[in-house]
A protein has these predicted regions:
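Residue-level signal for the short linker/turn that defines the boundary of a DNA-recognition helix
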Residues: 11, 21-22, 48-51
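Short alpha-helical DNA-recognition segment
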Residues: 21-40
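Short C-terminal boundary/hinge segments that cap the last helix of small helical domains
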Residues: 61-71
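Residues within the helices of the helix-turn-helix
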Residues: 14, 25, 54
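Alpha-helical residues within the helix-turn-helix
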Residues: 18, 29, 58
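Hydrophobic micro-packing sites on short alpha-helices
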Residues: 53-57, 67-68
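A short, Lys/Arg-rich alpha-helix, primarily the initiator
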Residues: 1-19
């Protein structure tokens, strides 16, 4: 069951990132995150920390709660 949330969260992050037009590499660099780590977040393979969730939200210019919409 937990994996479902990680996958859904990753899909939401990917959807929002793609709306910015940025590649994973450019977005990860912009927020100070390793690209392979960020890729694994989008793939639903990481149980990400709150600090990194906030970095992603700030980079996407959305609220943290927006990242969890429809989960």
């Amino acid at each position: 069951m937990n994996d479902e949330y990680l996958i859904a969260f990753g899909q939401r992050v990917r959807e929002l990132r793609q709306q910015t037009g940025l590649s994973q590499e450019k977005f990860a660099l912009m927020i100070g995150m390793d690209r392979t780590y960020f890729s694994s977040v989008e793939a639903g393979k990481r149980n990400i920390s709150l600090i990194n969730i906030k970095k992603i939200a700030d980079g996407l210019e959305v609220s943290v709660s927006n990242l969890f919409e429809n989960l």
